[in-house]
């Protein structure tokens, strides 16, 4: 059942943590709580979220992504976990399977940011796609599993004064959501400044 928006510009976010061990209670999931905290700091426009904690099973991941976009009506879906080279890491495969348009720039930029910190970022296979239905479209992105890496990829890199050195991927998300017919997203610039061409800016 589609979620009811409390405001025309309310962003519906789906957060999916993908982990065999966290989903069975072996350890506590850190990905979704980290994302909740980040959005609370980063967004100034209205939003609500739907969360899922599921195992590394491709069919389950695909079903969950489809449910969040097609049934719930999410505009943005973020996953954490399952993007490495191990046999059980199938999040990118599931994401590509449900997408109608690949968005390779997001994964490329995530790896560029993470390579500033660890050489093993090369092993990460994060992807992003647009999923389109006749009446709706959403952006789906894979993120790292660690809270520190999640923040780095979303916000990018800043110098000591807080000036952006390398843009984070979320800077491009609001305009992407505009282009696919979603709500107008506004951010806290000190956390992550949304970029739009002048023609796409809303007059306040």
Question: Which residue ranges define each predicted feature?
Answer:
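Non-catalytic beta/alpha edge segments that cap or flank active sites
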Residues: 1-204
